[in-house]
Amino acid sequence: VFYNPAMSGSRTRSVLLLRHALEEGFLGEGTVYALDGLTASGLRARRWLNELPHEDAERISATIVDLEEDALRWAEASHDEFPPNGGTLEAAKGDLRSVVLRSGRHWVDIDPYGSPMPFIDSAMQSMARSGVMEVSATDTAALTGSSSTALMRRYGARVSTDSLAHDSGMRVMLANFSRVAARHDRAIVPLLSVWDSHHLRVSFRVLKSVSTANELE
């Protein structure tokens, strides 16, 4: 089962941001339907349930998604061996692009190997009226302009390969996600953007709002 220790900081930030979103009311007042796509070890979702305060963890209904049955079996066994602080965990085997559409989601995490773009449209369609998405990208050569053809092909953009290239890459990600959101009468509000070693990661609110989507330039 794949486990990446280099992403431990990313998982920690995810727990902190989820707690902030709950405290600020970004995710409504009832059950929070959260999805950890491309989950592998399932550790990110398990940390949500184990490290949030009990009253927050109890609100989380987490789904972990992976194509590998062995990974999901391992994640479920670990979950059973080390019971969470609250909430529920469900495993779903399949392609994230179809599984995410089975239910509305308040929180979606997408952490692929390479570009996240193949998953964004279906994930955006699944979002509740107010929710949060966290998206990683490891195709940093493209996003920072080192591979300009891949950048244009995947993201339809050009950037300067200078000291601000990683910042530019995160802006390219957000611009693409904003356009996808607008196609589904939604708008995004950036919350956190991070360049961490081998990957770029952006976190943003997703709001159902035709009027705000119309302001896209």
Q: What is each model feature region?
A:
Residues 1-217:
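SAM-dependent transferase fold signal centered on methyltransferase-like domains
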